Amino acid sequence: MKGKKKVKEPAGMNIPEIFAALAMLEKERGIPQTFMMDKIIQAVTTAYKRDHKDVENVIVDVDEEHQRLKMYVQKNVVAEEDYVDPFNEIPVEEAKTISARYEIGDVVNIPVDNTEFGRIAAGNGKQVIIQGLREAERGMVYDEFNSKQHEILTGVVTRIDPRTNAVSLRIGTGTESTEALLLSGEQVPGEELVEGQHVKVYVVDVRRSTRGPQILISRTHPGLVKRLFELEVPEIYNGTVEVKSIAREAGSRTKMAVWSADENVDPIGACVGPKGQRVAAIVDELRGEKIDIIKWSEDPAQFIAAALAPSDVVDVMMAEEGKACRVIVPDDQLSLAIGKEGQNARLAARLTGYKIDIKPESYQGEDDEEIVDEEPVQ
């Protein structure tokens, strides 16, 4: 009978620096050690199989107590006459020299040479940890800014692309700061930004990407106006006054509908502030953009009439079906109601959600002429 074959167990890779790094990641960045160790195991397994393409099954054993890693190639125990694949099979007689308990169909773990495994583990472990740090930082930045969606943040202009006019902003501080790009289409027309300038922006969305979180910001979004009013008007911040809707053409004019359930509170007066100070501060921040504050009404006709300010309204006739209406205004205020290049009517339509057909008081249309909702308001 053959003597039992002594197969030396691998001493394993004593890599305390890897374990220490994983402990640091868990403590300081909140990344579980088990999560990172799984990534290291996956990386070293992939690397070994890349160098040994014929090997099918490899496992890595983690000895946390002694801070060691051990790698084994798994081989199936087969009969002598069926033995054809030395990379993935071991004859039963050879297996029994390792341990008499092995039978055909069992799996034997064959230790991988320490020197080779050490080279693979050290290199791949380091790369995984570096990548883990990057992912942790990206994750922290994403979590930080994802919680600030639809909020206002202040950024510092760091660069302006002379070709696209896109503005790079540094938002946040320290490890949780990141670059955000203010595209030309999200900039207020006519507004000139310069490097070093502090700028308030509205966070439209935060997305994950392979290069880190992408923060989509805007200076033209109606949400910027709403958040600015929340900062300036305590009654909006605490919910006493509610912003019902906003229509905006950035850099030119905004219409905002407000309402309060408290009959003792004037929602328009609260937004304007003493001597107009509150609204003036927002106009300054928006570089002179005009702001019309409208009192919202659950009666569509009243709301539409108010939305067409500063024009007076004689009558509002609602369509029987759909969201459309015809508004009659004094002849001498037709141009005022429509506004320059149709802006006043356009903003009123967006604010109310109704298609508005404006006619002068001298309009001679048929009394029963149908009001048609021809197209949705954009």
Language-model features, listed with the residues they occupy:
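RNA-contacting regions in translation and RNA-metabolism proteins
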Residues: 1-378
